[in-house]
């Protein structure tokens, strides 16, 4: 699944490629993805110009003259800009055709993605209203993490993957951040000390920013998911060797998600 760094890289690419383009038409081949594609989408976008491309958590936000297009890539989705016409494939569900002939194509084999439209404030939209602070901003801190963890009866990994707590931390980067912080993923969130929360907030920012700076683990240009296992200390390395102490890594499932950690280095 594309996580925050992958979505941010997609945002930057789209900002570069489609800002200022005018929509000529919208072609919807699959009217229902995870949620129904708004039937008014073509009428709402036709003739409108893309003013900006922003991000909230894992949601891409395309600001148009009349409102906002909200896109979530789901498990397997990606957006690709075609500069010349190409016949759609089986999983090419939505095309936004621009007046210069280019096409922004949404491809999603599993149909877990979402395309929504709103003319209201983004903060009021049901998909965005309950999202927590962005992890790369000052609003997310160790003090904040300590405060929200006091009353949560959940393990720490699931706490930081909760979009209501912090926006956009997915499975990959939760594993990596917890390893760097030296915290077991299955510890009760309420057991974390203030110092541990400070350390974890720092490592969450580190792994996300490093992934963005390195170009992430997801080939956004082609949309193919290409992970680089050597870049990870724990994710995808269940029963491998710890890069720090040389001990054996353990693999468990938390919240039905694969979780890998070092029982020596993480307490």
UniProtKB/Swiss-Prot annotation:
Pfam families: Fapy_DNA_glyco (PF01149), H2TH (PF06831), zf-FPG_IleRS (PF06827). GO terms for biological process: base-excision repair. Its EC number is 3.2.2.23, 4.2.99.18. Its cofactor is Zn(2+). Keywords: DNA damage, DNA repair, DNA-binding, Glycosidase, Hydrolase, Lyase, Metal-binding, Multifunctional enzyme, Zinc, Zinc-finger. The keyword Transmembrane helix does not apply. The active site is at residues 2-3, 58, 257. InterPro entries: DNA_glyclase/AP_lyase_DNA-bd, DNA_glyclase_Znf_dom_DNA_BS, Formamido-pyr_DNA_Glyclase, FPG_cat, MutM-like_N-ter, Ribosomal_uS13-like_H2TH, Znf_DNA_glyclase/AP_lyase, Znf_FPG/IleRS. It catalyses: Hydrolysis of DNA containing ring-opened 7-methylguanine residues, releasing 2,6-diamino-4-hydroxy-5-(N-methyl)formamidopyrimidine; 2'-deoxyribonucleotide-(2'-deoxyribose 5'-phosphate)-2'-deoxyribonucleotide-DNA = a 3'-end 2'-deoxyribonucleotide-(2,3-dehydro-2,3-deoxyribose 5'-phosphate)-DNA + a 5'-end 5'-phospho-2'-deoxyribonucleoside-DNA + H(+). DNA binds at residues 91, 110, 152. One of its GO terms (molecular function) is zinc ion binding. CDD domains: EcFpg-like_N. Binds 1 zinc ion per subunit. PROSITE patterns: FPG_CAT, ZF_FPG_1, ZF_FPG_2. Transmembrane segments: none annotated. Monomer. Belongs to the FPG family. Involved in base excision repair of DNA damaged by oxidation or by mutagenic agents. Acts as a DNA glycosylase that recognizes and removes damaged bases. Has a preference for oxidized purines, such as 7,8-dihydro-8-oxoguanine (8-oxoG). Has AP (apurinic/apyrimidinic) lyase activity and introduces nicks in the DNA strand. Cleaves the DNA backbone by beta-delta elimination to generate a single-strand break at the site of the removed base with both 3'- and 5'-phosphates. PANTHER family: FORMAMIDOPYRIMIDINE-DNA GLYCOSYLASE. This is Formamidopyrimidine-DNA glycosylase. It comes from Pelobacter propionicus (strain DSM 2379 / NBRC 103807 / OttBd1). The gene is mutM.
